[in-house]
Amino acid sequence: MDKNVSKEVKRIIICCIASCIIAVNIRTFVRTGGLFPGGANGLKLLIQSIFDRYLHITIPYTAINVLLNAIPVYIGFRFIGKKFTLCSCLVIFLTGFLTDSLPAYTITSDILLISIFGGLINGFAISLCLKCDATTGGTDFISIFLSRRKGIDAFNIILGFNVVILAIAGLLFGWDKALYSMIFQYTSTQVLHVLYKQYQKQTLFIVTNKAEAISQLIYDTTVHGATIIDCEGAHEHSEHKIVYSVVSRDENNSVIRAVREADPQAFINSMPTNELEGHFYQRPID
């Protein structure tokens, strides 16, 4: 099988698995606990719950899912990537279909366990989608668009959106549900932060005598540039060079392994980068 075809098949399979996990999580944990996840999924469940409780109208999850994702999907096609958006559409439609089709099943009625384990599962499923260049839809499209095309950190925007959802949920369905939903969202975010590292940056300081070779190696491995700085060892007063570069967190280990192979004597200091200004190459999404 052609390598590209094999890659796309694997991508589709992972998207399907993630959709199944999200749908099962909604039917077992989220619905049982009456929780409202963050982002578009939380808004969909909130709309469903409002219509069901106050208007006695049952709206299929799929219908709300498609309607709320219309504009984000357009943004994805127009500004992010067609394959990326098509895979995301697969996740959106399959998640909606399975959520409407699967029977509800109660694993536990303990709301704290539901909040924690539901959040763990949700974060894992979202990270699966992101690792294969897809999203679960909704605010994910907007977040990626703002961060990649406009250079805007969408965290505060998404946070504000979630606060509004939880405030409405608290007023209509009880503040205990809103507070437990915060635990769900926090757990999900922490799992996502651990598993998906592409948007996290790592700074490398490499003291070496093979600076040119290592700079080229970093570029060949990550397409990131490097800066070479002359330096002197304080103890032995020996001359060295420092290779300074910033890479994505998920590229960090592969760069360090490659540097070790090129120069076993290199001294490497790797540290998290909290803020970065200026041009930083990001792999195109498609």
Model-predicted segments: where are they?
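Positively charged, small/polar-rich N-terminal and surface patches that mediate targeting and assembly
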Residues: 27, 55, 117, 158-161, ...
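Core subunits and conserved enzymes of cellular information-processing
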Residues: 1-211
